[in-house]
Amino acid sequence: MDIAFHPQINEFNGNVSVQLIIDDIHSDSIVDEEIPSQNQYKIFDNRKKVWNLQNINNEIKKASSNIKVFIESKYIYDTVKKYPELASRVCSRYEITKCDVLMFFDYPADKKTLDIILEKAQPKKVHFMSYEPKVMDEAEFLKTFTGMVKFAAHNMGGKIDLVRCAGFLGKSIEVFQRLLDLYEEVGFLTVTDRNNAFYIIDFKGIDDLSKVLHSTKYAEIFDMIVECEAFQRSLLEDDLAEVLL
């Protein structure tokens, strides 16, 4: 997809409006600069662009390139699902396949996951779109995760999808593996099966989350959560060529 985005201010009869302009990146009037990189792919920085999803959807429809859109967070997917060309190209870390262009509407929570995605996709071009990291306080985070555990116990036969947890809450899979191990340790559940993709649990009940909050192991997990948020912030704010080395 050889396009870039920039806003243009228009004034007519005293009325001012802002229009999103889509540029061909091979055009002489290019505004969106390619970031110099030592990687095998070209990096395009759209992190601070104000973009219109309908326009992007239309451009993707016209493109001849094989385009993939990385999104795992439900709240981000909900913003693009009504645009068929975008939605049909959405993939998670496990669904990603080789492509020409990879667009990050969602940001991985750790370098390991980012590297896995890029290795699978082997893209020629990578676009980083604007993104708002999902940040929660400890109480909100644990309450949300606990709700997901209860839902899995009552509706999914005890199967907890680690990627879904990671995508929904914007954290690494390792965070949720450690959390589930801690929940088992304090007696909230028993893990009957586990692998890198999912856990199967026998839910016992959650009587007091302070058992988790006051655990020294949770302090270590919280440090991991902070590291995830710092990595996503780095992808959003820092020199992409350096972050992606």
Predicted regions: what they are:
Residues M1-C91, C99, M103-D106, V135-L245:
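Acidic, two-metal ion nucleic-acid-processing modules in DNA metabolism proteins
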Residues D100-E138:
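Long, low-complexity, charged/polar intrinsically disordered regions in eukaryotic proteins
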